[in-house]
């Protein structure tokens, strides 16, 4: 089947894919056509960032669907946010991002308001006004997400 990938410059790339293709496969096809390394690609469909190991079928992407390609900034790094259910969310951050900004990224992906999020790294709860750099968060780091009950102060 054919799908389309639209870049931020407005260019549309046509790809021949199968619904069983993984997002990683799709990124490889984008690389073949455009020369953009997969690790710099972020594919978005219906407002959600698509995860490499999932398939087009997992996201109900059908023929003639349009994905949006966003390039990851150099200097950015990918971290994982692990929920209490064990689900891992991949998030791109910059070293200069505040914890509050990281929480906004979690909200974009999961719909959880930042005020309800507590992020833990290295056994410490992270303060909203501190940066990833302050906590020495690096690529591949795993942050733990705990939900704060409304009205509960920790």
From Swiss-Prot:
Pro-peptide positions? 153-154
Q: Does the keyword Nucleus apply?
A: yes
Per the UniProt entry, the disulfide pairs are none
Q: Which GO terms describe its molecular function?
A: mRNA binding; protein tag activity; ubiquitin protein ligase binding
Q: Which SUPFAM superfamilies match?
A: Ubiquitin-like
Q: What else is known?
A: Synthesized as a precursor protein containing a N-terminal ubiquitin-like protein fused to the ubiquitin-related protein.
Under the heading Pfam families, the entry gives:
ubiquitin (PF00240)
Name the record gives this protein = Ubiquitin-like protein-NEDD8-like protein RUB3
Q: Which UniProt keywords apply?
A: Cytoplasm, Isopeptide bond, Nucleus, Repeat, Ubl conjugation, Ubl conjugation pathway
Glycyl lysine isopeptide (Lys-Gly) (interchain with G-Cter in ubiquitin) crosslink, residue number(s) = 48
Sites of the Glycyl lysine isopeptide (Gly-Lys) (interchain with K-? in acceptor proteins) crosslink: 76, 152
GO terms (BP aspect): modification-dependent protein catabolic process; protein ubiquitination
The source's superkingdom equals Eukaryota
Q: Which residues form the Ubiquitin-like domain?
A: 1-76, 77-152
InterPro entries given for it?
Nedd8-like (IPR038738), Ubiquitin-like_dom (IPR000626), Ubiquitin-like_domsf (IPR029071), Ubiquitin_CS (IPR019954), Ubiquitin_dom (IPR019956), Ubiquitin_ubiquitin-like (IPR050158)
Q: What is the lineage of its organism?
A: Eukaryota, Viridiplantae, Streptophyta, Embryophyta, Tracheophyta
Q: Please provide, in alphabetical order, the Gene Ontology terms of the cellular component aspect for this entry.
A: cytoplasm; nucleus
* Family recorded in the similarity comment: Belongs to the ubiquitin family.
């Amino acid at each position: 089947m054919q799908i389309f990938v639209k870049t931020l410059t407005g260019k549309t790339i046509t790809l021949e894919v199968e619904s069983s293709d993984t997002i990683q496969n799709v990124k490889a096809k984008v690389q073949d056509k455009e020369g953009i390394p997969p690790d710099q690609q972020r594919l978005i469909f219906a407002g959600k960032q698509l995860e490499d190991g999932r398939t087009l079928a997992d996201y109900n992407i059908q023929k003639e669907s349009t994905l949006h390609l966003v390039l990851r900034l150099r200097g950015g790094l990918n971290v994982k946010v692990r929920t209490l259910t064990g689900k891992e969310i991949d998030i791109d951050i910059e070293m200069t991002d505040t914890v509050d900004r990281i929480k906004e990224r979690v909200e974009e992906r999961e719909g959880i308001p930042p005020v309800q999020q507590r992020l833990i790294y290295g056994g410490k709860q992270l303060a909203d006004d501190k940066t990833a750099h302050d906590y020495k968060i690096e690529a591949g780091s795993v942050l733990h997400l705990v939900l704060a009950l409304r009205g509960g102060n920790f």
